[in-house]
Amino acid sequence: MVARRTVELIAACAVVTHGVALSSAPVSMGNSLRSDFPILQQRIWEDKPLVYLDSAATSQKPSAVLEAMQRHQERDNANVHRGAHLLSVRSTEAYEGARDKLARFVNARSRSEIVFTRGATEAINLVAQSWGRSNLQEGDEVVLTVMEHHSNIVPWQLLQEERGIVLKFAQLDEHECLDVAHLRSLISPRTKLIAVAHVSNTLGCVNPVSEVVTAARAAGAAVLLDACQSVPHMPVDVQALDCDFLVASGHKMGGPSGVGFLYGKMELLEKMPPWQGGGEMIRDVFLEKSTFAPPPSRFEAGTPAITQAIGLGAAVDYLSAIGMDAVEKYEHQLGTYLYSRHAPRLCACVRACASPLGSASSRRPALRPRLSEIPGLRLYGPDPRQGIPRAALCAFNHETVHAADLATFLDQVES
């Protein structure tokens, strides 16, 4: 996969871009929000300010999120749904309040369409093991794309081994965006699901969900969206998208790790069997058999990640207060800025890595090329200057410099 050897520069998300110390940045949202993030206040590498550009992997957390989690641990820590005492009631209210916030954030029709999971990976596995086992037979088809994260490939490969389903992969077009015509050509009467990234974590392209959904509906297929790179960066409306399933991870939304969510249309969730067994997902338990709770409880077996869910709710509050339209606009400016401005330090790092001596003097080239003009640099995904929708992230390789070497140089370069 391309992502294994790429260096990623992410000028992405209001919860991260405030770490970008660019003296002529397009607007000041980043600088105004930087103080909200305790981790960005530290000094590193000879007393230089921390500049964090790895949000596509995990985002940093604002004080509001950290404080909400600490407050719960210090004041309200108790199990949810299982006690009548004050702490349990308060903990349950906060936990379910986070579900309400997520439902509003993605415009779900009902709070019951939001299932808490450990993250997007678990959410996709839940769909594969519950919906997939109930609806996919030998010879049925799942259409994916070659740009998918491993989390949206491996669960379907496991089901392929178990059930004999067929996996098909849509290719990219000349701009390294989804080739919708090729995707359509893969769809047949046996196609039951199309599972695609809303935004590619490596290519940055924003996939045309409406075209994918239209093609799926014509074949009677369901649609799953991996929205890890879209939910924190742009307005996402599941009703407008008309997807059947959508997954995202809290740690990419300014929230904690260990929590995420699955959105599913209620008419599908109601028909899906439990994936895991345990407390809370049952209605009645007898020695001979058990009956199961309705969604979302049916899919939340055992004690959930309560504090993490509350932290995710606080992250949603934080993003909502900024406004997702404002976040999207700012990130578009940052992405264009990243591609169009001169990149002398990156060029210097490339030259230093490529030089047998790696001398310090090689870090200050006379030329000031733009990112796309650095010799030997291979950029992935569409160029935002071409007017093609894409996220504010950049992945690249160099033809002679190993990604690990270049990443090490970039990690220590002056901000």
Model-derived segments and their meaning:
Residues 2-3, 26:
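Intrinsic-disorder-associated interaction segments
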